[in-house]
Amino acid sequence: MIHAFIKKGCFQDSVSLMIISRKLSESENVDDVSVMMGTPANKALLDTTGFWHDDFNNATPNDICVAIRSEAADAGIAQAIMQQLEEALKQLAQGSGSSQALTQVRRWDSACQKLPDANLALISVAGEYAAELANQALDRNLNVMMFSDNVTLEDEIQLKTRAREKGLLVMGPDCGTSMIAGTPLAFANVMPEGNIGVIGASGTGIQELCSQIALAGEGITHAIGLGGRDLSREVGGISALTALEMLSADEKSEVLAFVSKPPAEAVRLKIVNAMKATGKPTVALFLGYTPAVARDENVWFASSLDEAARLACLLSRVTARRNAIAPVSSGFICGLYTGGTLAAEAAGLLAGHLGVEADDTHQHGMMLDADSHQIIDLGDDFYTVGRPHPMIDPTLRNQLIADLGAKPQVRVLLLDVVIGFGATADPAASLVSAWQKACAARLDNQPLYAIATVTGTERDPQCRSQQIATLEDAGIAVVSSLPEATLLAAALIHPLSPAAQQHTPSLLENVAVINIGLRSFALELQSASKPVVHYQWSPVAGGNKKLARLLERLQ
């Protein structure tokens, strides 16, 4: 049978009540206990789950409904649960030692007075009340993150349209994850700082993408959630467009990564055009969409979270290196490789980056010869007639490198350093000497940038790390792969043109939060030393929305 009682005028968040429900369900002579606020949606849930009691007809959204399933008919069971509930609520009010300093208020005005620099409202109340609170936040020029779900599509469109008109951002509804300016919002991870700005219409998608970025040794600037419906045909990607504009204006976000559930096709095209407008290297992952091309201008398409993370990290490293070098903006690329397969892959990759065709005939080891860009395989038979392979004797390559001193139109030199048994004792040292001769023969305004990969292991006779150190100490850029080497070379010759720099939005510089709903979110922000005020909201006028709006206007 069901025992029941109501605790009047004691609004609590749903997570706290679920925890209390589990604790009370462990009581003696009790099968199960359900503790919920008396909202219409919760009453319907109590009915469908078999916990309904007619006493709940008198409950308002500010009242706690307690339903106890027990085989015993003893009325004292309800009394015992009532006492335990009072104790649980008392402990909740007192909180832990870390929560005693949490600033708590019961009115909007008080929240804004306590935190005058507030620029974000984090809303996690029942969906039927969330939209009204979000509008009130927009009234106060606050950005909004709506963790709440069960918000109508019409309300979402209205809120996001209004926010965009005001130059604000609405994340959500049903937005579970954001990490902005180092501030963890709802479900978030502690991320290393980097130069990748993340946008997502998928909470766990953002978390997995960011986790993979961290595992690869890179970091993020921000991760902006949108809510799962943002890229639907009806919503039209309103918040996605705002987020892209915000990160476009953020100097620290040099690379962008975007992940979403399957979008409407018209919206996808609109978002891709907005990505292009940023001018920044951008990785786009539209789950369920198979791109016709791997790259469209400054937009790289991925087909999985793992691939998106790897691409973002690759672009992150390339962009950081490119920005650390004086722009070339013209000139040609020359690749002098000792390994045939390495030369072939480098040629194919570079041809794709430059929009040219790789050489099909490979005459005299010429793997690429287009628009004055060349990739040559010096291990080709043409170069080994009467002389050792260049991995054994690097004399020929070193001479060709030195000869580049008289070819100032060549601005970027691609190289491989292959070590191991059979290879020359110190290929890096002889390569550095040849490159330095070429550089010395040029004018100061005619630099020759060198980019190298090293093939081999730490246990090889030449020692991988020692070879890398020799190259880097001389000023040669050492990268981990041919895709990174060729992409960096192309980026130096043909750099992307970011959109005109704008002022970084204040939200991306510092986040100060008015938390409305789940107390745990405020405690987590406090533990992260982020400015937060907890607004202990409860339904106004007993949940009567018309009367609540009237009272709001009278204030």
Curated annotation (Swiss-Prot):
Its EC number is 2.1.3.5. It holds the Pfam family Ligase_CoA. Optimum pH is 9.0. No enzyme activity is detected at pH 6.0 and 7.0. Activity increases in the pH range of 8.0-9.0. Induction: Induced by allantoin under anaerobic conditions. Pathway: Nitrogen metabolism; (S)-allantoin degradation. Optimum temperature is 30 degrees Celsius. Its cofactor is Mg(2+). One of its GO terms (molecular function) is succinate-CoA ligase (GDP-forming) activity. InterPro entries: CoA-bd (IPR003781), SUCC_ACL_C (IPR005811), Succinyl-CoA_synth-like (IPR016102). It is an enzyme of class 2 (transferase). The keyword Magnesium applies. GO terms for biological process: bacterial-type flagellum-dependent cell motility; tricarboxylic acid cycle. Keywords: Magnesium, Transferase. Oxalurate could not be used as a standard substance due to its unavailability, and the enzyme reaction was performed in the reverse direction: the synthesis of oxalurate from oxamate and carbamoyl phosphate. NCBIfam families: PRK06091.1 (NF004760). The OXTCase is composed of 3 subunits, AllF, AllG and AllH. Component of a carbamoyltransferase involved in the anaerobic nitrogen utilization via the assimilation of allantoin. Catalyzes the conversion of oxalurate (N-carbamoyl-2-oxoglycine) to oxamate and carbamoyl phosphate. Belongs to the AllF family. This is Oxamate carbamoyltransferase subunit AllF. It comes from Escherichia coli (strain K12).
